[in-house]
């Protein structure tokens, strides 16, 4: 499995892999091909991961949104094999409920589970749990089955 180099990623901070934090400040118009390349790299790596969105701006251009939607539909199964969830961090409970509802639409369209949590710490804990469940860690699974 190819090693991941954090310097190869502009749109995702992978220093806490399997937590991949989306960097909206780098998502300027025309970013979708770069996004696709980074997601392809994460998929080729082959280990389960979670993408965390801390800043929930929705200023994506129509062209970028369309590019990503087409790619997500075409790669739904392959991405779902390694991307265990999209996690949105939203401290405000009312806004978090809205984000969770919006996430359900994406789940139906692209098949990747979505979670809305109150803090980055909760996102990291959830990511650890989700990726551990799917990592094929035989010792952990054996311990749970015993």
Question: What name fits each language-model region?
Answer:
Residues 2-146:
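Amphipathic, Lys/Arg-enriched alpha-helical "gate/interface" segment within cytosolic domains
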């Amino acid at each position: 499995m190819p090693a991941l180099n954090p310097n190869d990623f502009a749109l995702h901070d992978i220093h806490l892999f399997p937590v991949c934090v989306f960097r909206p400040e780098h998502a300027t118009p025309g970013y979708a091909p770069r996004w696709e390349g980074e997601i392809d790299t994460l998929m080729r790596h082959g280990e389960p991961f979670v993408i965390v969105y801390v800043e929930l701006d929705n200023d994506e251009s129509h062209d970028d949104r369309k590019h990503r939607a087409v790619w997500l539909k075409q790669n739904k199964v392959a991405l779902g094999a390694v991307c265990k969830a999209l996690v949105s961090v939203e401290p405000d409970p009312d806004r978090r409920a809205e984000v969770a509802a919006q996430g359900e639409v994406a789940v139906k369209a692209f098949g990747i589970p979505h979670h809305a949590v109150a803090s980055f710490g909760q996102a990291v804990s959830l990511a650890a749990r989700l990726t551990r469940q799917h990592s094929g860690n035989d010792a952990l699974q054996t311990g749970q089955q015993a």
